[in-house]
Amino acid sequence: MWYPLIGGWFTELPHPGDGEEERCFVRIYTQLDTWKKFQVGKRVARNGAGMADYILKLFDRELIRFSAKDTGDIPEISITHIDQDSLSLIPLGMEVTDKGLARWLKHRKIPRNRAYIHSFLAKTGLSANSTMGIIDVSKGLSLNDSYWVVREGDSKTFDQCNLYDNKFSELLANIAFTGYGSSVRTSVVSSPEFTTNGMLPKCWRRQSGKIYLYKGGTVGASNTGNEPYSEYYAWQIAQILGVNAIEYNIAKWKSRLCSKCEIFTSKDVSFVPVGNIVKQGGMQAVIDYYGTLDSKYRDMLEDMFVFDAVIANTDRHFGNFGFLVDAATNTLKAPAPLFDHGNSLFNFASPIEIESKDVFINFADIQAPVCYSNFFSVAKSCMKSRHREGLRHLLNFKLKKHPRYNLSSKRLKYIEIAVQKRASLLLEGETHSESELSFW
């Protein structure tokens, strides 16, 4: 197993020249010969019939050569070569083993719980069970970063194929968002939809030279479909609190209400979710990791806990916050702006909960985070003076209505009251309230 650390990579290998079972940690550049011999033997043993040869690249730089056999959701992988001078450019959090690369490839495709996934893939002649089939068509290109995967012998360049600069299929965007549309020849497919995470209907659209994410809401019940409103109003609250968050608007596309936001990554700046780096230990492990970083990262994490407590964000998970990364050097650049606040501001309150203020407030009071136990104890334990100033501004705030699309005036009023109450609760007492999480 290889371990990414600041300043280099470590791997666990047999002690050189020692026939015993003893193992030790050594810097990778001291074990290149051992690693190459290990890989050659493995390649001879495992590179059997039915495997195709691929290259994982960053821009046009080769990182890893490997053979792959499409055996379903997780492909059979055999790494055949690792560029010794590019170890620091390996995707953050990816274990450079056959299984580690297979897992990375699995997550380089549209998730199984995505709305309309089967319709989307069927229209392109693909299957959710064929990871390498999807990779063959999409080249693993993403709007999160500048990694991609090509068949050995493919002469195309990153400039010719990347999704940031090149046109992508409007037809596939339509299918991804609505589930309807004509079949598409995979030989001409270029779309970010193959590598976009999340379960709600969504698609990327290029407008006036910029790229925007359109995301619909839940459907099927009287308390669904409010996510676009929550995104729009949560951003207003972030502005009052001084929190760095992505601006959302409300729009309609294909007759469906959706949120709309501009992309915050580029060819040069990638997004890496914290879950790619901190893989176990839960939120406490995340806090501990942030504690090893510059103060701007700790400030952002504190801002997130306070903001989530105010808006009752019940879907903050390890995939929707993290880091902006310099794509050229693969090093942390800044904390990523906060995004994905559709499951906040009591979006699942039903018509029954809207009948009276008291019923709505009771519903608001029982909301809980997904990765820790209590909004208020955690937020209070990391609050600073900058947060109190913003919270005081929320005590009498009013939501600004959208020019065209809005929740009912009654629901908006109740949201304002609930947010004001939550701000007041956070301002009460000292900041050392008991919390299940410990900070710096």
Q: Predicted segment positions?
A:
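Phosphate/dinucleotide-binding and metal-coordinating scaffold of catalytic cores
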Residues: 2, 8-9, 24-31, 35-306, ...
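Canonical protein kinase catalytic loop motif
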Residues: 317, 322
